Protein backbone atom coordinates (compact mmCIF):
# COMPACT_ATOMS: atom_id res chain seq x y z
CA UNK A 1 0.00 0.00 0.00
CA UNK A 2 2.86 2.38 0.74
CA UNK A 3 4.29 1.88 -2.77
CA UNK A 4 0.94 2.71 -4.30
CA UNK A 5 0.67 5.91 -2.24
CA UNK A 6 4.26 6.89 -3.07
CA UNK A 7 3.60 6.40 -6.82
CA UNK A 8 0.44 8.49 -6.57
CA UNK A 9 2.30 11.31 -4.77
CA UNK A 10 5.06 11.33 -7.42
CA UNK A 11 2.44 11.36 -10.16
CA UNK A 12 0.63 14.34 -8.60
CA UNK A 13 3.96 16.14 -8.10
CA UNK A 14 5.03 15.60 -11.72
CA UNK A 15 1.58 16.64 -12.97
CA UNK A 16 1.71 19.82 -10.84
CA UNK A 17 5.22 20.79 -11.99
CA UNK A 18 4.24 20.15 -15.61
CA UNK A 19 1.17 22.32 -15.17
CA UNK A 20 3.22 25.16 -13.71
CA UNK A 21 5.75 25.00 -16.54
CA UNK A 22 2.99 24.81 -19.13
CA UNK A 23 1.28 27.89 -17.70
CA UNK A 24 4.46 29.98 -17.49
CA UNK A 25 4.23 33.19 -19.48
CA UNK A 26 5.89 32.99 -22.88
CA UNK A 27 7.20 36.13 -24.52
CA UNK A 28 5.54 36.42 -27.94
CA UNK A 29 7.62 36.77 -31.08
CA UNK A 30 7.73 40.29 -32.46
CA UNK A 31 5.64 40.84 -35.58
CA UNK A 32 7.51 40.73 -38.88
CA UNK A 33 8.93 44.02 -40.15
CA UNK A 34 6.23 46.06 -41.89
CA UNK A 35 8.05 49.16 -43.17
CA UNK A 36 8.82 48.82 -46.89
CA UNK A 37 12.33 49.79 -47.96
CA UNK A 38 13.18 50.75 -51.52
CA UNK A 39 15.99 48.64 -52.95
CA UNK A 40 18.26 51.09 -54.79
CA UNK A 41 21.20 48.72 -55.32
CA UNK A 42 21.51 44.97 -55.13
CA UNK A 43 23.82 45.30 -52.12
CA UNK A 44 20.74 46.39 -50.09
CA UNK A 45 19.31 42.89 -50.48
CA UNK A 46 22.50 40.86 -51.00
CA UNK A 47 23.12 37.90 -48.73
CA UNK A 48 21.53 34.63 -47.74
CA UNK A 49 17.81 34.53 -46.95
CA UNK A 50 15.68 31.61 -45.76
CA UNK A 51 12.10 30.85 -44.79
CA UNK A 52 8.98 28.85 -45.52
CA UNK A 53 7.79 28.70 -49.12
CA UNK A 54 4.02 28.47 -49.41
CA UNK A 55 1.97 27.64 -52.47
CA UNK A 56 -1.32 29.32 -53.32
CA UNK A 57 -3.69 27.52 -53.08
CA UNK A 58 -2.03 25.65 -50.21
CA UNK A 59 -0.73 22.19 -50.93
CA UNK A 60 -0.31 19.44 -48.36
CA UNK A 61 2.98 20.70 -46.91
CA UNK A 62 4.97 23.93 -47.06
CA UNK A 63 8.61 23.83 -48.12
CA UNK A 64 11.81 25.43 -46.81
CA UNK A 65 13.59 27.74 -49.25
CA UNK A 66 17.05 29.31 -49.19
CA UNK A 67 17.81 32.27 -51.47
CA UNK A 68 21.29 33.66 -52.06
CA UNK A 69 21.53 37.12 -53.67
CA UNK A 70 24.90 38.42 -54.83
CA UNK A 71 25.96 42.08 -55.06
CA UNK A 72 25.49 42.04 -58.86
CA UNK A 73 21.85 40.86 -58.62
CA UNK A 74 22.55 37.23 -59.51
CA UNK A 75 20.60 34.79 -57.36
CA UNK A 76 20.33 31.09 -56.64
CA UNK A 77 17.59 29.36 -54.70
CA UNK A 78 17.06 25.87 -53.33
CA UNK A 79 13.82 24.55 -51.88
CA UNK A 80 13.89 21.25 -50.03
CA UNK A 81 10.52 19.75 -50.79
CA UNK A 82 8.74 16.64 -49.65
CA UNK A 83 8.74 15.43 -53.27
CA UNK A 84 12.30 16.45 -54.16
CA UNK A 85 14.45 19.53 -54.58
CA UNK A 86 13.37 22.65 -56.47
CA UNK A 87 16.25 24.89 -57.47
CA UNK A 88 17.06 27.65 -59.91
CA UNK A 89 19.15 30.69 -60.63
CA UNK A 90 18.97 33.92 -62.55
CA UNK A 91 19.52 37.64 -62.25
CA UNK A 92 17.26 40.17 -60.61
CA UNK A 93 16.49 43.57 -62.09
CA UNK A 94 15.51 46.61 -60.04
CA UNK A 95 12.08 48.01 -60.83
CA UNK A 96 10.45 50.67 -58.63
CA UNK A 97 12.64 49.74 -55.65
CA UNK A 98 11.78 46.03 -55.90
CA UNK A 99 13.67 42.96 -57.08
CA UNK A 100 12.17 41.33 -60.16
CA UNK A 101 13.18 38.30 -62.20
CA UNK A 102 11.58 36.38 -65.03
CA UNK A 103 12.74 33.10 -66.51
CA UNK A 104 11.30 30.50 -68.85
CA UNK A 105 9.83 28.77 -65.77
CA UNK A 106 8.09 31.77 -64.16
CA UNK A 107 8.52 35.13 -62.45
CA UNK A 108 9.33 36.42 -58.98
CA UNK A 109 9.05 39.79 -57.21
CA UNK A 110 10.93 40.61 -54.00
CA UNK A 111 10.14 43.47 -51.61
CA UNK A 112 12.40 44.42 -48.71
CA UNK A 113 10.97 45.38 -45.30
CA UNK A 114 12.81 46.71 -42.27
CA UNK A 115 11.85 47.65 -38.71
CA UNK A 116 13.78 47.98 -35.44
CA UNK A 117 16.94 46.60 -37.05
CA UNK A 118 15.14 43.50 -38.35
CA UNK A 119 14.83 42.76 -42.05
CA UNK A 120 12.48 40.63 -44.12
CA UNK A 121 12.38 39.89 -47.83
CA UNK A 122 8.81 39.22 -48.95
CA UNK A 123 8.81 37.19 -52.15
CA UNK A 124 5.87 36.38 -54.41
CA UNK A 125 5.90 34.63 -57.74
CA UNK A 126 4.28 32.18 -60.11
CA UNK A 127 5.39 29.36 -62.36
CA UNK A 128 4.30 29.06 -65.97
CA UNK A 129 1.81 26.34 -64.99
CA UNK A 130 -0.05 28.89 -62.82
CA UNK A 131 1.15 27.74 -59.40
CA UNK A 132 1.65 30.78 -57.17
CA UNK A 133 4.29 31.01 -54.45
CA UNK A 134 4.89 33.30 -51.47
CA UNK A 135 7.60 33.44 -48.81
CA UNK A 136 8.65 35.75 -45.98
CA UNK A 137 12.42 35.31 -45.83
CA UNK A 138 14.73 36.32 -43.00
CA UNK A 139 18.49 36.91 -43.24
CA UNK A 140 20.49 33.84 -42.31
CA UNK A 141 24.12 32.76 -42.20
Please provide the spans of the model-predicted regions.
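Edge beta-strand at a domain terminus
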Residues: 27-37, 86-96, 125-141
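C-terminal motif of bacterial Sec signal peptides marking the signal peptidase cleavage site
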Residues: 19-22
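N-terminal glycine/threonine-rich, aromatic-flanked beta-hairpin/loop signature
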Residues: 59-96
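Short, solvent-exposed coil/turn segments at beta-strand boundaries
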Residues: 45, 67-75, 94-98, 112-121, ...
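An anionic, turn-rich surface loop/hairpin at beta-sheet edges
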Residues: 81, 88-90, 95-116, 123
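Bacterial N-terminal signal peptides that target proteins for export
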Residues: 1-12
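N-terminal helix-cap/turn-to-beta initiation motif at the start of protein domains
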Residues: 32-50, 66-70, 87, 141
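Short, surface-exposed coil-to-beta transition loops
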Residues: 59-65, 85-89, 104-109, 129-135
